[in-house]
């Protein structure tokens, strides 16, 4: 790369902003030129950690855009604000890396795509699970034909709860007041485990299914009496070749990056010629094939630059003109969002729903 990419981080609703800014800070051809958030205290850690000058920190996002003139904006708003924030920032003529999920609804996702189409700039949706080595290895093995055609994906994932950790997975113990105040627990801001985690499973599921869409979806959520959002959901999607399941959970016994809980977090994938289990943060994937039905392990291959994290990958695509592919692409993420929207309606109406379009 010859160009130094100017990057701004706007809206710190999601603590993943710290992780993404660290990736930008560590990139040899990227420079953090500005950060913006209406609550200045939420920027303090980033300012201190990455040596951001006080003049580069703003409480007004438009001033940040006007004065720092970034090439790329990283956005981490609450889920319900993804479309609004894309429409606010896109007119600056910047590329946007949006932290997961895609959007609060399919309609919002289409608004985001339309806003970016007007500028001719790129939009990518980051899913942190896309950068887990076991999942990348599983996808490679599927593409190599090791287990034949994928017929089922089964996903169980989550954590102890969104307030039990911050940037860099630093553990915290949330107070009742923090829970009450957090957007994660507010329905009108896109909170709940379903909207937080189901898109992971469905979007990576699209990747594993090679772009196939289900025909219909049924979903059930828990209904905690003291909360306005769910902490657990189970979605079943019927494809032409079989059923796949996606289970989200806030309240796992342990966080998977510390100790894998039971059930384990990650995927089990069944194909016509074998199976793969690829769990979060593990060193190997486990495979069964016709010739070795007893199963064996394959080491998860390390990720290498420029394919080791979303900032590296997005800048590589922008630099080379290679299209954004896989879960970060709008095309794949939109199918994942179709399944999420259908699941939301199914849970609300308590019935099976044909895939929404």
What annotation goes with each model-predicted range?
Residues 1-51:
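N-terminal Rossmann-like dinucleotide-binding module
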Residues 1-4, 9, 30, 72-74, ...:
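C-terminal helix-rich "cap/oligomerization" subdomain common to oxidoreductases
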Residues 3, 196, 201-283, 311-323:
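Contiguous beta-strand/loop segments that form the cofactor/metal-binding neighborhood of enzyme cores
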Residues 39, 50-115:
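Beta-loop-alpha module in the N-terminal Rossmann-like domain of NAD(P)-dependent dehydrogenases
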Residues 98, 123-125, 278:
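Hydrophobic residues in well-ordered beta-strands that form the structural core
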Residues 111-129, 149-153:
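Rossmann-fold dehydrogenase core element
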Residues 128, 170-180, 257-331:
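C-terminal glycine/acidic-rich active-site capping loop/insertion
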Residues 130-225, 350:
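Predominantly a Rossmann-like dinucleotide-binding segment in NAD(P)-dependent oxidoreductases
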């Amino acid at each position: 790369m010859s160009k130094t990419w100017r990057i701004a981080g706007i809206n710190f609703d999601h603590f993943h902003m710290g992780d993404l800014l660290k990736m930008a800070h560590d990139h040899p051809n990227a420079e953090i030129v500005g950060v913006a958030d209406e609550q200045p205290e939420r920027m303090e850690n980033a300012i201190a950690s990455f040596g951001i000058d006080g003049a580069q920190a703003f409480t007004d996002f438009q001033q940040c855009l006007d004065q720092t003139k970034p090439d790329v904006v990283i956005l981490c708003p609450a889920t319900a604000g993804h479309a609004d924030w894309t429409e606010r920032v896109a007119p600056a003529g910047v590329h946007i890396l949006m932290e997961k999920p895609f959007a609060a609804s399919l309609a919002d996702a289409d608004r985001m795509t339309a806003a970016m189409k007007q500028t001719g700039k790129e939009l990518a949706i980051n899913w942190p699970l896309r950068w887990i080595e076991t999942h990348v290895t599983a996808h490679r093995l599927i593409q190599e034909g090791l287990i034949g055609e994928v017929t089922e994906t089964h996903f169980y994932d989550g954590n102890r709860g969104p307030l039990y950790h911050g940037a860099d997975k630093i553990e915290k113990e949330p107070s009742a007041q923090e829970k009450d105040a957090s957007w994660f627990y507010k329905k009108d801001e896109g909170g709940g485990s379903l909207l937080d985690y189901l898109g992971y499973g469905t979007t990576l599921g699209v990747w594993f299914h090679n772009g196939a869409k289900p025909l219909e979806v049924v979903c059930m959520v828990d209904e905690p009496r003291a909360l306005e959002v769910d902490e657990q959901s189970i979605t079943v999607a019927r494809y032409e070749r079989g059923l796949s399941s996606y289970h989200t959970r806030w309240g796992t016994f342990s966080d998977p990056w510390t100790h894998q809980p039971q059930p384990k977090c990650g995927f089990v994938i069944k194909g016509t010629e074998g199976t793969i289990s690829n769990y979060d943060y593990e060193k190997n994937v486990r495979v069964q094939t016709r010739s070795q039905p007893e199963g064996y392990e394959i080491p998860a291959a390390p990720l290498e630059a420029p394919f080791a994290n979303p900032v590296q990958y997005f800048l590589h695509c922008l630099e080379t003109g290679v299209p954004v592919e896989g879960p970060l692409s709008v095309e794949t993420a939109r199918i994942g969002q179709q399944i999420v929207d259908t699941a939301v309606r199914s849970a609300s109406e308590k019935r099976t729903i044909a895939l929404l379009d």
